[in-house]
From Swiss-Prot:
Any GO BP annotation: mitochondrial electron transport, ubiquinol to cytochrome c
Protein source organism: Myotis levis
Entry annotated with the keyword Protein biosynthesis: no
Cofactor: heme b
Residues the entry annotates as binding heme b b566: H97, H196
Protein name: Cytochrome b
Organism placement in taxonomy: Eukaryota, Metazoa, Chordata, Craniata, Vertebrata
Gene that specifies this protein: MT-CYB
Function comment: Component of the ubiquinol-cytochrome c reductase complex (complex III or cytochrome b-c1 complex) that is part of the mitochondrial respiratory chain. The b-c1 complex mediates electron transfer from ubiquinol to cytochrome c. Contributes to the generation of a proton gradient across the mitochondrial membrane that is then used for ATP synthesis.
Membrane topology: Multi-pass membrane protein
Pfam assignment, any one: Cytochrome_B
Amino acid sequence: MTNIRKSHPLVKIINSSFIDLPAPSNISSWWNFGSLLGICLALQILTGLFLAMHYTSDTATAFNSVTHICRDVNYGWVLRYLHANGASMFFICLYLHVGRGLYYGSYMYTETWNIGVILLFAVMATAFMGYVLPWGQMSFWGATVITNLLSAIPYIGTNLVEWIWGGFSVDKATLTRFFAFHFLLPFIIAAMVMXHLLFLHETGSNNPTGIPANADMIPFHPYYTIKDILGLLLMITALLTLVLFSPDLLGDPDNYTPANPLNTPPHIKPEWYFLFAYAILRSIPNKLGGVLALVLSILILIIVPLLHTSKQRSMTFRPLSQCLFWLLTAXLFTLTWIGGQPVEHPYVIXGQXASILCFXIXXXLMXLTSLMENHLXXX
């Protein structure tokens, strides 16, 4: 009799994905973020489910229902701050995961990569809609500003914005539909994660050298299960430290003021994980141009596989490309900082320069440097 693990229709799928899966023997801790993202998604769905049991999506009561969760529900404050800071952990892991893919050439698995980019968009949309739900000042004005960007689309823009709002401003209808979508999207994301893994398991994992590791594979369990558990413990420690010691560190104090359409906050800004994109949006003086740059800042990931001109897959043995990669990282950190600053003299010009640098590195310099390195390797 064969083992149930290998014969049962459902269990054998789990077995071939998490137990007997052949994995390269040399994948580093940068390969931990996939499993951490899975845990983040599960945590967000779970805490979100319990929050939704006590939340009301009505403009009159939304803000008070969140206060009620924090004050009156048993451990409601833990749920709320786990959910809010869990989103931050989610994005930290996401950006590191994408950065790993760029550095080690994992984008050469185009199907896996493209689904990953769509997943990134979906998670960003979900996070944006979630930020609107507490109905504080930043929730309301963030929703107003970001949905208004769609009015830059020629001809249909204004109608589109009013259709999304369900009226002539962000109001009751908007909040209700955002709650509905915020609840629905994570389950769609979970389904897409399945497809992401399905495509990954067609090819197997990449590794730090970028050279096929077929000759040297080890079973996923116990080696990488224990390694993933270590990563999980570190992430949970960081998350709990944040939640229990300074839960509002990454939040905006303005969101503790109930939404007021008659009073605009002095500095409207999104959560920290969108600041780089917000800075790119603001650095272009034209509305439509800014919106295009905002979308392209993420969409550019789709064309990365097309711009791969190197004979080597990974950047491990390409010092010039490494310099560009870390310059890109520095430029994104700079944009994140500038996105949180007011629109004043030094920040505007620096933001424009960083934006141009980001696009230039990703779209032109990487491809040219790789071509140059091919000749260096020959010498």
